[in-house]
Regions:
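Membrane-embedded alpha-helical hairpins and interfacial helices in multi-pass inner-membrane proteins
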Residues: 71-146
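Hydrophobic transmembrane alpha-helices
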Residues: 1-16, 20-23
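Mature catalytic domains of secreted/periplasmic carbohydrate-active enzymes
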Residues: 16-27, 34-36, 70, 81, ...
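Hydrophobic alpha-helical transmembrane segments
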Residues: 22-27, 49-54, 76-80, 123-124, ...
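Internal catalytic-core helix/loop-beta-alpha segment
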Residues: 52-83
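Structural signal for the C-terminal ends of transmembrane alpha-helices
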Residues: 13-19, 58-69, 135-144
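Short, charged juxtamembrane terminal tails flanking transmembrane helices
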Residues: 146-156
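Interfacial aromatic-anchored transmembrane helix boundaries in multi-pass membrane proteins
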Residues: 1-4, 28-62
Length: 156
């Protein structure tokens, strides 16, 4: 099950985060990947992690393209592009890095087929979390403006 906010958070940070701190989430995610993989799950570290980290960087970069033009369709299209690219890249990396599937076209297709159930959850999570993250500041701003216009203030 891959229902996570990671892609959405990277898009949002790329779009709304300070430019000088753009590498902070990438560094934190990479460090947590290494710690979880080697110390918690006790799996060997493999080059396929670099594929995931490249995807993280790509999502941050894609988010920066939303700084100037963050319309709803562009945001959701970016989230969907993130889901598809992660599915393609991560499954290719698993096929290439590990001996789980034969190194043939059939083995690659089998690997992609095994990833489809995760992909459905990833798309749902990416779209839901992206919509929530990008909508929240808009809604908060609209409510704040409405309250100011109506004279409704919360006592501090």
């Amino acid at each position: 099950m891959a229902f996570t906010p990671v892609g959405a958070a990277l898009l949002f940070f790329g779009a709304r985060g300070p430019r000088r701190q753009i590498l902070v989430p990438l560094a934190l995610l990479a460090a947590s990947d290494v710690i979880l993989t080697t110390m918690v799950y006790r799996y060997p570290f493999s080059w396929d992690h670099f594929v995931t980290w490249a995807w993280y960087a790509g999502m941050l970069w894609l988010g920066t393209s939303l700084k100037q033009n963050a319309g709803a369709l562009r945001i959701l299209g970016s989230a969907l592009a993130g889901s598809v690219s992660f599915f393609l890249l991560s499954n290719f990396a698993v096929w290439a890095a590990w001996d789980m599937y034969p190194r043939t076209a059939g083995g690659l297709l089998t690997c992609y087929g095994a990833g489809v159930p995760f992909f459905r959850h990833a798309v749902a999570g990416d779209l839901l979390f992206t919509a929530a993250m990008f909508a929240t500041p808009v809604v908060v701003h609209a409510v704040s403006e409405w309250r100011q216009k109506s004279g409704d203030h919360i006592a501090a």
